[in-house]
Regions:
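HTH-adjacent hinge/linker in prokaryotic transcriptional regulators
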Residues: 1-45
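Conserved acidic
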Residues: 23, 46, 167, 171
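Short, acidic loop-to-helix structural element flanking the phosphoryl-transfer center
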Residues: 43-53
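Glycine-rich phosphate-binding loops that contact phosphosugars or nucleotide phosphates
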Residues: 52-182
Length: 182
C-alpha cells in the first residue's frame, strides 16, 4: 500500500539530522516510487517496436556520453552475452566513423539522461542518413527524442530530486533489461 501512496515518497527531503537509517529509507523509497512511475509511463507499442528492431538487427551499437556511458556499457554487456554482435562507443570521433559504416540492418541505441547533447544528436542524424534504425532512451521533448526512429522517453520526476542520478540510471538500466530479455 505504501508503494501506491505517492505522497508517501514525494514528501521526503534530506535533513542534516537524519540518521543513516532514515536517509537509507528516503533514498530507497524515492527510487522505488520513481521507477514505478517510469514503468507506468512507458509506451508499450514503442517498446515492442524497439524489441523487434533489436531482434532483427545484424549489429547493435550503444552510443552515450558522460553519466549515460555506464548504462551503454551495461547494455552492450547484456547483448554481447546473448551472442548479439554489439559495441559501446562513448568517443565522438569513433561514433561518427562507426555511423558511416552502418546500414538498414543495424540498430543504434542512443542513451542520454539529458537528451540535449548536440554531439549525440548530430551522430544520430548521421546514423539515420545511412538508414540504420535509431532507438533513443532520453527525456521526452528533447532534441534527441525528435531525431530517433523509436523514442523510449524516460522522464525522471521531481520526486526523485534527492537521488536523481541513481534513479535515472536504474530506470535506464531496467529498460535495457526489458529490451534484452524481450
Amino acid at each position: 500500500q505504501q508503494l501506491a501512496a505517492d505522497e508517501y515518497f514525494t514528501s521526503y527531503e534530506i535533513d542534516p539530522n537524519d540518521s543513516i537509517q532514515v536517509l537509507t529509507e528516503k533514498v530507497f523509497d524515492t527510487t522505488i516510487s520513481e521507477i514505478l512511475n517510469i514503468r507506468s509511463q512507458l509506451n508499450q507499442e514503442l517498446l515492442d517496436q524497439a524489441i523487434e528492431a533489436l531482434a532483427n538487427s545484424k549489429r547493435i551499437e550503444f552510443f552515450a556520453f558522460g553519466g549515460s556511458a555506464p548504462v551503454a556499457m551495461d547494455a552492450q554487456h547484456k547483448f554481447f552475452r546473448l551472442k548479439i554482435p554489439s559495441s559501446c562507443i562513448s568517443d565522438q570521433h569513433i561514433k561518427f566513423m562507426s555511423a558511416n559504416s552502418l546500414n538498414k540492418d543495424d540498430v543504434v541505441v542512443a542513451i542520454s539522461h539529458s537528451g540535449t547533447t548536440s554531439a549525440l544528436v548530430d551522430t544520430v542524424k548521421t546514423v539515420r542518413s545511412f538508414n540504420a534504425c535509431v532507438i533513443g532512451l532520453m527525456p521526452s521533448g528533447t532534441p534527441l527524442s525528435k531525431e530517433c526512429d523509436i523514442s523510449l522517453e524516460i522522464d525522471v520526476g521531481d520526486s526523485a530530486r534527492l537521488n536523481s542520478p541513481i534513479t535515472s540510471r536504474l530506470a535506464y538500466m531496467a529498460i535495457i533489461d526489458v529490451l534484452a530479455v524481450g
